[in-house]
């Protein structure tokens, strides 16, 4: 008892000693603390801030902390021997020193210093310890403060530590031998790193440590330190820092936790925003691995850093992550990309910044692919600067080349930025089909992706959830599901196997499409394994033809599983490469056989059987292996073979050799085979015998009796044929002749008509035998048996027209074979016809081919002539001069070209034109000599030809007395003195009845070309014009041929002559030049005018907007011609109408062209 009490006391004492040792140690804090060693009889305040020391900042990890600096100029030392200094710890929060003692052998470690440098000051070190993020090393950093007295001396630092398992039976203070020492790695900056390996299993235990520092020959030893490594973990910085704009328009900052951290972390996020309008900074602490920043603006820059620390309990902040910068675009779409399924509704948001100014959401419009403007009914104004567009019931996106999405553009009214949002719409309607095997042990599901659009980077996965019993009425996707591995098969389907299975559990499954833009699920389907059973095919399938009945009997055995009632389906058909199957259903679950009628008893039939649940659930099984019938004789042959004979021997003798010939029986006649043939003989002397000839089809015997009857029987495994043919050979009957005539008519090389005429007879005719052979060949005789009622027969065989054939007709009586009728050639008339027809075989195809060729040629010529007369040649009824004329009257053509009272609205065909210089002279005098030529006409007549260098002198128009105009002509100076390439010019006038004679006189003025008058052959051509004033027209040809003088012609004659002469001019330069044609006419007349087009070759109405009352000229044709020749400053109404070049097309679009592409010159 005393011993036990003593042991208990010792145990309590040891425990108290250990606890005391731990209590005397300094608990290391997660933040930095300081080791201070000071001289004796000095207060802590004096030590902390002596004379010549000041505060400075130093930091191991970036923070600035209070430190002591030493100024050597203000401090003096004296030599001291055996001076004891106290070392203690103090934290940043507590300025008082802790755990100091002056007894070397006492309760704490003290440092003894024999030096004169610590008379009035001590030494200081910053210490910070933590457990590395990988939880393997405990690290302590020791950093000497700036201006340390021994900073110029090399110093060494050692860390002594003891693990908890070594402290067994330890005294109050651990002995020196129980500590382990590690050497600390010191850098040139007086910063030392001490690494203590800590087992993972001891992270929650307490670790005792102390520091031993040697510097300048002085040894410093710190008091004990205690720490739990798990409370000093310093995680690694967060990884994968990234930023993105969310679907709600916020900036999402996200990152990943560092690995190997055994507890959750909290995070500190600091970010700054820099934009043209806002600059802000923020610092937030969150427990999640993401942070949302609202109020994002386009064209802004964000810089973010993150660090982590233990969420619950003590810990050390990690280092800051690498800064990450994110810049927003001028146009922000959120979300920037959307992946959705067919039939869904999605929305895009947009913020638009234009020239450092955010556009109002009311001014934003949306476009699809820059080709289709989205209706405003789909817009929503979220805020002043955020616009929203919604798409309803989307259709599948059709790929356009490499683009598999639709581009959605957010635009500032009519200005669109090049950035766009992407809309992916795919059809996720994937059909999943499942079947349970016949052993009810596994369920196989198959599905294909051929029906959906494949997106790059997408993966497909089948997911399912099993319910405890049956399926719900409406399957739905459960948030908790399991994936199933599926493998691609050679047929393009994916196949997944569920094994084991629960027959009555509902398996809800769907296909999940995983993509970086999101996930889509196909419509779910629920499968009950018991409802998709595919039974094993029926076994022991047999097929046979029943004897004497001829039915196809099929039998089978029902599979073991499932135990439900089954229905069966049979298919059968004639065996061959391609079997034409016939189907037969058996609904009686107890049936195991069935008999079916077949048309051919002697054919080989292939039979297969399959089964399915009779309640409609499940699937059809596979077809069983085919079973085949065996051809067997089911009955005796229906009849014997047809046969004929060949008689050889002297016709004068009584004995002849008769060879019987017959054709083998078909299967449908022999039912189903013939093993042998038997010939029965019966003679007139009542002699009867049989001969077995086996399978031969020829037999010869000797005919010696007056009458000899033979019968050929067919015998199979069941018996001999019942109905047989008899043939009697009789000498008397061989002389009976009832065939009067026999004729053969060849139709072609494969058919000959044989006809005959019979005479009356007392014998009963049974049938005929037709026999024929080629006389030029030693071939076998061919024969046919035909009915006795036939008088004409078509023989189908290969006949050569130049060969000779023998045809024989034998009448067969009951008493015997009659006398035959034999012919050796075809009928004479038909022979000649056939010989004539031989040439037709060559002539007729030639005639037919020639006729077809001639017909095709006529059709082509007809089309060309039709085009020539009806398309290339214009319809005269569409011409203006033909309006109101009746071409049905003969007198119309007599006066057609004599007189025209209406103005001509279209000129002759123009050749390649060139800018010209010309004058127009008047042949008829003015009534009023004082009147002047109208200004508009003068301006046209005085056109300056800048290109040719020719100037028309038109001053005479302002001074000449037009009463004397007949002897007056406008002169023109041509500097180049070369002949112009102008073919003609046109002047047309339709004066109103109220117009004065002076205006009409102008029309009769003479016309002079812009070249020397002495070289002009046309000077006097129009002096005595006899044209009507209402339809006067002048055609002025350039002086290309001096010998050609245009005579005075009527209008129609002049037009024809001009067209004839026009083709004689040489081709000119092909360079394109602007050309202008003017016609002078009244507005009233011109509005009803017509214009000739070069394509249609007909006259079409001249557009009213082309009247010079509202002058419109094509923009690319506006030139100095209009500026020089039209006095647009006058207010008088213009009476000129533009004559469009005939090389352009007059169409229904003329008005639109005039409105859109012509420059308005209206005064």
UniProtKB/Swiss-Prot annotation:
Spell out the GO cellular component terms annotated for this protein, sorted alphabetically and separated by semicolons: basolateral plasma membrane; external side of plasma membrane; receptor complex
Family per record: Belongs to the type I cytokine receptor family. Type 2 subfamily.
The cross-references to InterPro entries, in alphabetical order and at most eight, read:
FN3_dom (IPR003961), FN3_sf (IPR036116), Hematopoietin_rcpt_Gp130_CS (IPR003529), Hempt_rcpt_S_F1_CS (IPR003531), Ig-like_fold (IPR013783), IgC2-like_lig-bd (IPR010457), LEP-R_IGD (IPR041182)
Q: What does this protein do?
A: Receptor for hormone LEP/leptin. On ligand binding, mediates LEP central and peripheral effects through the activation of different signaling pathways such as JAK2/STAT3 and MAPK cascade/FOS. In the hypothalamus, LEP acts as an appetite-regulating factor that induces a decrease in food intake and an increase in energy consumption by inducing anorexinogenic factors and suppressing orexigenic neuropeptides, also regulates bone mass and secretion of hypothalamo-pituitary-adrenal hormones.
Domain description? The cytoplasmic domain may be essential for intracellular signal transduction by activation of JAK tyrosine kinase and STATs. The WSXWS motif appears to be necessary for proper protein folding and thereby efficient intracellular transport and cell-surface receptor binding.
**Cytoplasmic topology ranges:** 861-1163
Instruction: State the oligomer form and interacting partners.
Output: Present as a mixture of monomers and dimers. The phosphorylated receptor binds a number of SH2 domain-containing proteins such as JAK2, STAT3, PTPN11, and SOCS3. Interaction with SOCS3 inhibits JAK/STAT signaling and MAPK cascade.
Expression sites (tissue/organ): Widely expressed. High expression of isoform B in liver, adipose tissue, hypothalamus and choroid plexus.
Modification after translation is described as: On ligand binding, phosphorylated on two conserved C-terminal tyrosine residues (isoform B only) by JAK2. Tyr-984 is required for complete binding and activation of PTPN11, ERK/FOS activation and, for interaction with SOCS3. Phosphorylation on Tyr-1139 is required for STAT3 binding/activation. On ligand binding, phosphorylated on two conserved C-terminal tyrosine residues (isoform B only) by JAK2. Tyr-984 is required for complete binding and activation of PTPN11, ERK/FOS activation,for interaction with SOCS3 and SOCS3 mediated inhibition of leptin signaling. Phosphorylation on Tyr-1139 is required for STAT3 binding/activation. Phosphorylation of Tyr-1077 has a more accessory role.
Q: Which residues form the Fibronectin type-III domain?
A: 237-331, 537-632, 637-730, 738-831
Q: Which GO terms describe its biological process?
A: angiogenesis; bone growth; cytokine-mediated signaling pathway; energy homeostasis; glucose homeostasis; leptin-mediated signaling pathway; negative regulation of autophagy; phagocytosis
* Name of the featured protein: Leptin receptor
Phosphotyrosine-modified residues are where?
984, 1077, 1139
User: Signal sequence span per UniProt?
Assistant: 1-21
Matching PROSITE patterns, A to Z? Answer: FN3, HEMATOPO_REC_L_F2
Which intervals of this chain are the motif Box 1 motif? 869-877
Chief localisation class = membrane
UniProt-annotated stretches for the region Leptin-binding: 465-482
| Compartments where found | Cell membrane; Basolateral cell membrane
Question: CDD domains, per this entry?
Answer: FN3
Molecular-function annotations in GO:
cytokine binding; cytokine receptor activity; leptin receptor activity
Q: Which residues carry this modification: Phosphoserine?
A: 880
Please give, as recorded in its UniProt entry, the membrane topology of this protein.
Single-pass type I membrane protein
Motif WSXWS motif per UniProt: ranges: 620-624
Protein encoded by which gene: LEPR
Which Pfam families does the annotation name? fn3, Lep_receptor_Ig, ObR_Ig
Can you list the disulfide-bonded cysteine pairs? 37-88, 87-97, 129-140, 184-194, 350-410, 411-416, 434-445, 471-526, 486-496
